[in-house]
Amino acid sequence: MNTIDNNNAAIAVNSVLSSTTDSTSSTTTSTSSISSSLLTDGRVDISKLLLEVQKLLREMVTTLQDYLQKQLAQSYDIQKAVFESQNKAIDEKKAGATAALIGGAISSVLGILGSFAAINSATKGASDVAQQAASTSAKSIGTVSEASTKALAKASEGIADAADDAAGAMQQTIATAAKAASRTSGITDDVATSAQKASQVAEEAADAAQELAQKAGLLSRFTAAAGRISGSTPFIVVTSLAEGTKTLPTTISESVKSNHDINEQRAKSVENLQASNLDTYKQDVRRAQDDISSRLRDMTTTARDLTDLINRMGQAARLAG
């Protein structure tokens, strides 16, 4: 059995402790107090010592692997929570966009219905006004026509009566003049009466002409009122609403299409962001795995170097013994 003195073993253990890293020094420091099972008559069993050191190294590597795996699992849980939060935000945005689209469609439909109701109301009001104006104009025209007809008939009757009276008076005057020249005073009275009747007929004709002129002026005023109605603001508003009704469906369809395009772009940008975050997470996981593999290789190399050092120390101790 290969053994060395206690002093040489203490020197070898101290050199091993000084050559290892901080993580291994704390572990191997506990081996400085060698159990009594490794001591044989004041000497140390090198083989058992090497086995204990290898066990400690394996435990150290296992502990480090467990720690790194826990760190990786914790990082994965964090990334998973982030992704779930992003997915929840995406779902909420999609739901909000859908609700906004539905609300916009409902508002558009209500606006269309309101516009049609306003147009119908304005059209009905305009038609009522036009009908009332037409009825008033027709009544006025009928009144004027009737008054003109009556006035003309009255004037004609008056003129005819006057002519008849004048003719009768003239006949009577001629007859009276022919029968008796002595009745000059009676003829003069008849002539005066005829002249008075003629003047009355002339006055009635003048009144009829004046009334006809008044009716003609009333007709011209109604014609001007109809022209003002056609050029008034309500009439222009109704015309504008009728023209706007033609372009309203096109405007609504363009608005809905624009909202749909905006929602699609927003969803696409969110999906691109999620894909970018997933790629970043995969790269982080790959770097962490590479780092773990590199550290494990370094630890394996360190353990191999330590084993070689201990073997050389054992060989040196055997040669010295």
From Swiss-Prot:
<comment type="subunit">
    <text>The core secretion machinery of the T3SS is composed of approximately 20 different proteins, including cytoplasmic components, a base, an export apparatus and a needle. This subunit is involved in the formation of a pore, called the translocon, in host membrane.</text>
</comment>
<comment type="similarity">
    <text>Belongs to the SctB/EspB family.</text>
</comment>
<protein>
    <recommendedName>
        <fullName>Type 3 secretion system translocon protein SctB</fullName>
    </recommendedName>
</protein>
<dbReference type="GO" id="GO:0009986">
    <property type="term" value="C:cell surface"/>
</dbReference>
<keyword id="KW-0964">Secreted</keyword>
<comment type="function">
    <text>Component of the type III secretion system (T3SS), also called injectisome, which is used to inject bacterial effector proteins into eukaryotic host cells. EspD and EspB are inserted into the host membrane where they form a pore and allow the translocation of effector proteins into the cytosol of target cells. Necessary for intimate attachment to epithelial cells.</text>
</comment>
<keyword id="KW-1043">Host membrane</keyword>
<dbReference type="GO" id="GO:0016020">
    <property type="term" value="C:membrane"/>
</dbReference>
<keyword id="KW-0843">Virulence</keyword>
<dbReference type="GO" id="GO:0005576">
    <property type="term" value="C:extracellular region"/>
</dbReference>
<dbReference type="GO" id="GO:0033644">
    <property type="term" value="C:host cell membrane"/>
</dbReference>
<feature type="transmembrane region" description="Helical">
    <location>
        <begin position="99"/>
        <end position="119"/>
    </location>
</feature>
<keyword id="KW-0472">Membrane</keyword>
<keyword id="KW-0812">Transmembrane</keyword>
<keyword id="KW-1133">Transmembrane helix</keyword>
